[in-house]
Amino acid sequence: MKKLRVLVAEDHAAVRSSVVRLLSKNYDVVGTVNDGRALLEAVHTSEPDVLVVDLSLPVITGIEAASILKKMDCPSKIVFLTVHNDADFVRAAHDAGALGYVLKQQMTTDLPEAIDKAFAGEQFTSPSVRDV
């Protein structure tokens, strides 16, 4: 079975490395970027199945990048990876077209499930997110 192609957008190098290490076993990590503009460019060159995106990227935020990709009918599914444990952020993420919302502190348990569900067209939010 073909591994899902995942692109990681995270501006903190240590977190980016941890995400790649976590995902490399079961997914084809086709690239990493550290800002929203680079994410928009990389989507077209790497054609990922799923994007794992930090909500607070520099240059263009993750929310803004997701909104742009949604308007462009980008086929890649989006999973946000964030420290923001707040219902308003979750709503903004879903409004921008994301199917997944994973807290960084739950990454090892929640991110693989969120990626798989997003690829299947299903929503996933870390269970510990408040008031959703």
In which residue ranges do the predicted regions lie?
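Conserved active-site segment of CheY-like receiver
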Residues: D11, L81-N85, K104-Q106
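Two-component/phosphorelay signaling modules centered on CheY-like receiver
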Residues: H12-G31
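Residue-level signal for the "D+5" position in two-component response regulator receiver
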Residues: T32, L57-I60
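Acidic, metal-coordinating helix/loop segments flanking the phosphotransfer/catalytic sites
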Residues: T32-V50
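Acidic catalytic/metal-coordinating carboxylates
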Residues: D35, T61-E64
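The feature encodes the CheY-like receiver
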Residues: V53, P58, T82
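Short amphipathic alpha-helix used as the core "switch/output" element in two-component signaling
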Residues: I63-P75
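Short, flexible helix-to-coil linker/hinge segments that flank and couple to helix-turn-helix
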Residues: V90-D95, G100-V132
